[in-house]
């Protein structure tokens, strides 16, 4: 049993490599071993331990980069690094452990593997909302290396794709028990499912070439180190770097800066002057991340992480406040119990906004705004493309250095475009900035650590709404029913 525990932990670490940037797809079949060892466990306690150790390794290798973010201000938060590196995997591993525990009680069921897969997706969904939610590295994102294989997102959403992926990933589990009849059923059904996915994905991509609006957009990526971003001595250098990257000879309609690009109010006279000079020289509208407040004092004062638009006449065209805040980063949960300050700059916690759409009248452009972390929540982003034209996602991934975090964040965000049939304009201070079309094609992009800008046109949205955008998570029932039907029919063929 000791040896099995070590194997589960090591395979869990290997399984974390299925996500960006490695996309080591052979590691998907580590889940087959987990599925097998749970079924063969002597009791539910053993199944729970095997699942927990696998889960701990899985989240340790997949989300280690969070500790890098904590280490940015190491003098103040050195004590939090072990909690970020090990504490989060320790907690998240319980989701996989519980899945394995419940699956154990179905070990003699003819459809054990299907039950394991259904429970896997159930706990991914629970993970997306419990304690504010963290739907990061859902197993469906393992297929985001391929624009063809992610097309089912338009129908099923990420949870439906997760069910497909975990079904395929566990299809080899009978090889360990030498149950070759079951193996034939699962491998045949997996191959059939993959074939359908490839055909559907290829058809959807080929029949939806990228078409563009006439709205010109400039994405600015200054790649300012996190330690310099809030440094008063670096403020003017940082602002002028943004402006220099924005003021180019090519005409543009929109200039987009990243999350918290403006770390001071835009109405400070000298800041306002520089911004208006830039907007007059480019004849553009600026969409930027910044800090906003409710203009009140004392106990009524509230601070927001904002996205807003300014024109050359100093009119604020819209202001959006971030709705999904990062626990411990932008606010301290249980503040009366935990006597710590948040990780980001300042002593005051940010307040939640109300979500929704924003509008730029000049271009008749209806925008679904997303600030950073908000893009990982599929239900929050779910938007019918009959009421929105584009997703604009601003972020700051400079916290996480050259780790896997910025790559994972990009591919998670990109999935929202496919789900909703909307183009995405993604602008990172540092990370991956890109123009993405409504089927997930990367039209143009800047890589991690590049200091540059992208000039391009906003892609057109799809002409019809996606199934997911209309029905949300209910649409995940479609692949479940489809796979159950295939599994049943192949069982009739191969079973003795």
Curated annotation (Swiss-Prot):
Residues 220-464 form the CN hydrolase domain. InterPro entries: Apolipo_AcylTrfase (IPR004563), C-N_Hydrolase (IPR003010), C-N_Hydrolase_sf (IPR036526), LNT_N (IPR045378). It comes from the Bacteria. Keywords: Acyltransferase, Cell inner membrane, Cell membrane, Membrane, Transferase, Transmembrane, Transmembrane helix. It is a multi-pass membrane protein. It is found in: Cell inner membrane. Pfam families: CN_hydrolase, LNT_N. The active site is at residues 259, 322, 372. HAMAP family: Lnt. Belongs to the CN hydrolase family. Apolipoprotein N-acyltransferase subfamily. This is Apolipoprotein N-acyltransferase. It comes from Rickettsia typhi (strain ATCC VR-144 / Wilmington).
